[in-house]
């Protein structure tokens, strides 16, 4: 009799532990500390930025010596296929880092809002728009 009671209690305890262990944890994604990215047009916002600061006077123009080429007709493909962006972890994108840290352009750091434009464009998936 004692053995039957003990076995019954063990089965009940086992079922209880297993049913609690089957709880479905819902993991919600963390909120982005930067907030939602603003809309950035590659052709309307970034190409003018590149024209003003990057692809003039022998820097990131059509020549292969200073890749990537940032002339309007080649810029998107050069950036995307050259590995300069990372849409999974946008703030680790090379294009963003060199502008944000001030290492490019060599004539002086761009205003912070220009680095933010690049980051937001990458955060939006780096569309060719």
Predicted regions mapped to residue ranges:
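Sec-dependent bacterial lipoprotein signal peptides
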Residues: 1-22
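Aromatic- and Gly/Pro-enriched helix-to-coil junctions and flexible linker segments
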Residues: 21-129
């Amino acid at each position: 009799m004692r053995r039957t009671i003990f076995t019954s209690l063990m089965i009940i305890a086992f079922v209880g532990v297993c049913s609690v262990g089957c709880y479905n944890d819902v993991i919600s994604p963390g909120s982005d500390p930067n907030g939602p990215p603003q809309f950035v047009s590659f052709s309307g916002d970034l190409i003018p930025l590149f024209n003003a600061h990057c692809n003039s006077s022998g820097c990131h123009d059509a020549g292969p010596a200073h890749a990537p080429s940032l002339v309007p007709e080649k810029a998107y493909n050069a950036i995307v296929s050259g590995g300069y962006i990372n849409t999974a972890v946008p703030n680790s994108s090379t294009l963003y880092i060199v502008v944000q840290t001030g290492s490019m352009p060599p004539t002086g750091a761009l205003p912070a809002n220009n680095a933010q434009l690049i980051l937001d464009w990458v955060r939006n998936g780096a569309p060719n728009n």
